[in-house]
Amino acid sequence: MSAPPNVNFSATLNGLNQTVTATQGLDVSDATGSNAGWNLTATSTTFATGGGPTLATTSTTVQSGPTRACDSGSSCTLATNSVSYPYALPAGASAPTATKVFNAAANTGEGNQTVTVTWSLAVPAATVPGTYTSTWTISLASGP
């Protein structure tokens, strides 16, 4: 997997609960020939301003299964995913144990493909204005 692009959420606080979304394309390449499948796992730190205010550790989710497509000009066997949604991205002051956000069952996921995840971020009405950041770790491992 190549380094995933950053995810940027943007919200204008208006005194109401909001959900903002952002997409992230994850380029996955499995040329092992093992047909063992693979897992994308993720974890994160809590969204914080650095000055105190934070968002809930359950604020980032994936509401429905990511889309997937073979990369242009390549041949692939699209991944068959068994992860249930909605998915909550684990978060904590120190990133907790990563969990599966997407997987390829055995005999699927061979070749080059892009898995596109639509992340949702819950922004409560009482959110203190500021720039919130979080560090995410997304990993690719062999096996169903």
Predicted regions and their residues:
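Signature of Gram-negative chaperone-usher
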Residues: 1-144
